[in-house]
Amino acid sequence: PGILGEGTSANFVDGQWLGTLLSIEREDGYWIKVSGETVELEVEGLPTDPNTEYSLHSGSNLVSYPFAGHAPIDETIPVYAQEAIIGIMGEGTSAMLTEDGWLGGLLELSGTEGYWFITDEAVDFTYNPPTDGMARMVSPVRDVPSEFSYRQSTQQAFYFVENATI
């Protein structure tokens, strides 16, 4: 197993953690790599302060979402911060900000996920808390039929097509 952070990682080898990732930071996002069957993960710690300020630099930023449940991107990220964000990538899903709003398969941020925010300028922001009902809801995980099973790669690409003739 291993943990990937923004510009850092650690792998569990022969009973010890090896790598440059020495601690887990609340405001940072992480991807946990496991091989084989489904793994149950126990996480210990205190909830992240919902007023945590996130400082994004220009480029790719791997960040957390501090709330339980989920909330729509356009509601939870303040408008001024959205203007600096080109796109957001999650595990196997993404969204891109256009003149018409957010497009793509990623519509909501979830407290159990880490996200790559791609920005064209530095911006500091605090998430807007989800509305009362959304904080307690969890998006269902879609089951994939076994004949279409796959392993999620940490190397992914997304394409947004404006026009297509079929």
What are these regions (language model features)?
Residues 1-166:
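N-terminal exported-region signature
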